[in-house]
């Protein structure tokens, strides 16, 4: 079944399988490149979307997995996690760091592991959904699986 997935999504599927996470990547008929579009396509609350945002901090990429209902307060987050300035990565930096385009960045399947922060608000949902490597692909998992998959640090991000 993974043969029918886009190449980038196959890398994500392999990473999920290696981590023992059963979430199956599904292909949506229309692009869901924002949390609101993904939530509408899945008929779920926008807060249950694990939005993958790539920032640049201390000369390296920083992946923030935030609830689709939140905006990241970069100044507050930098202080909470002991980082210097946190700024949005450029599309080129996102692609170089993740191998995936903006709007489809998965929490896994990257060329190298990324320092990851996971929004504590995602713990409120029994199931969350994340992008599967393209704007047309998504997969379900639990909060605990997301933290384990990414090796992320749980923090308040808004």
List where the protein language model places each region.
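Extended, low-hydrophobicity, polar/charged segments
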Residues: 1-158
């Amino acid at each position: 079944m993974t043969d029918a997935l886009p190449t980038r999504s196959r890398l994500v599927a392999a990473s999920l399988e290696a981590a023992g996470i059963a979430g199956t990547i599904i292909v949506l008929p229309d692009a869901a490149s924002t949390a609101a579009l993904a939530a509408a396509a899945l008929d779920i609350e926008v807060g249950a979307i694990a939005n993958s945002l790539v920032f640049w901090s201390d000369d390296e990429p920083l992946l923030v997995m935030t609830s689709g209902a939140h905006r990241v307060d970069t100044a507050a987050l930098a202080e909470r996690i002991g980082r210097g300035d946190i700024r949005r990565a450029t599309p080129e930096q996102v692609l170089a760091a993740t191998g995936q385009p903006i709007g489809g960045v998965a929490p896994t399947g990257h060329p190298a592991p990324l320092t990851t922060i996971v929004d504590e608000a995602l713990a409120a949902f029994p199931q969350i959904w994340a992008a599967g490597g393209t704007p047309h692909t998504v997969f379900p998992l639990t909060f605990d699986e997301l933290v384990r998959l990414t090796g992320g640090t749980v923090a308040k991000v808004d």
